[in-house]
Amino acid sequence: MDDERVSQDPTAENETDAEDRNDDDPSGSAPPQPVTHQRRLLLFVIAGVVLATDLLTKILAVANIEPGRPVWLIGDIVSLRLVRNPGAAFSMATGMTWLLTLVAVGVVIGVVRIGRTLRSPWWALGLGLVLGGALGNLVDRFFRAPGVMQGHVVDFVSVGWWPVFNVADSGIVCGAILLVVLTLIGLEPDGTRKGVEK
């Protein structure tokens, strides 16, 4: 009789189901995996858009802008001028192309690792911008002259006194600024607030 009462007790069945679910999760509470997958997808979609836009605009710039002959768009402030940059974003650190290539590879690996536990859409946006920009300039580093890991990046946007840049540079800088802001306000990649219990 006792066995029959236990088998008919819905509470006991619910507890058993909960234990079965927790067996797969050492923490005892399974994380909402669909949210993580969605944020990771958002990260890669943003990175893909930045990468595709960067590559397309560079192809158009090389095909249509003659070196040394800028195309003026807004007065004498904004223009398109073709520059092949051996340095980092905004023509910084010229002469260190191979080192910048290694740094960019490290950035890509770091972003992908963080993306494994990503749950914040804002972090997905920031990391996606950085990842897309890093990949865009890496393509130039590996496949443009003068050689692998020493290729010069194509820059073509000139605004006033600011160094000539490209779409990838803009993605890296905007993404980095967003990540700094998120860090300052205490928002973690997993969506939690620093100092607030999960």
From Swiss-Prot:
The active site is at 155, 169. It catalyses: Release of signal peptides from bacterial membrane prolipoproteins. Hydrolyzes -Xaa-Yaa-Zaa-|-(S,diacylglyceryl)Cys-, in which Xaa is hydrophobic (preferably Leu), and Yaa (Ala or Ser) and Zaa (Gly or Ala) have small, neutral side chains. Belongs to the peptidase A8 family. One of its GO terms (biological process) is proteolysis. Keywords: Aspartyl protease, Cell membrane, Hydrolase, Membrane, Protease, Transmembrane, Transmembrane helix. This is Lipoprotein signal peptidase. It comes from Rhodococcus jostii (strain RHA1). Pathway: Protein modification; lipoprotein biosynthesis (signal peptide cleavage). This protein specifically catalyzes the removal of signal peptides from prolipoproteins.
